[in-house]
């Protein structure tokens, strides 16, 4: 092709057999900081554990709209939420504190920012000891805010 020429690509019209059912399966959110899995306990506590067999780490990510998700524990039915102080907790019902902006970063990890506090850039994060990190203490570039969605089964 000569310089200055333009080309167009033909549209792909074939159907792909993608396993769409897998998108609906629960995930584990593996934190880059310390190797913890995000966990929502029955009492509403949010922390991390290294125990992959813990039932409280199985999470369902439910899209509200493009880039906006609810994160729900399949075991407790509670939704991940962030209050006005930036504390993570489990909520019995979905509300504005439960909606997070999901973003795939260049390093292939996901970050989750509270939609309610998006202008403050408060991320979901776990400390090196597995405790949840307050939103105001998180910022872009920290390992504490990087999560890798993994399948529940290791096969």
Curated annotation (Swiss-Prot):
It comes from Bos taurus. PANTHER family: FIBROBLAST GROWTH FACTOR (PTHR11486). Its main location: secreted. GO terms for molecular function: fibroblast growth factor receptor binding; growth factor activity; heparin binding; integrin binding; S100 protein binding. The lineage of its organism: Eukaryota, Metazoa, Chordata, Craniata, Vertebrata. This is Fibroblast growth factor 1. The modification N-acetylalanine is found at residue 2. Gene3D superfamilies: 2.80.10.50. GO terms for biological process: activation of protein kinase B activity; angiogenesis; branch elongation involved in ureteric bud branching; cellular response to heat; epithelial cell proliferation; fibroblast growth factor receptor signaling pathway; lung development; mesonephric epithelium development. In the nucleus, phosphorylated by PKC/PRKCD. Heparin binds at residues 24-28, 113-116. The keyword Acetylation applies. CDD domains: beta-trefoil_FGF1.
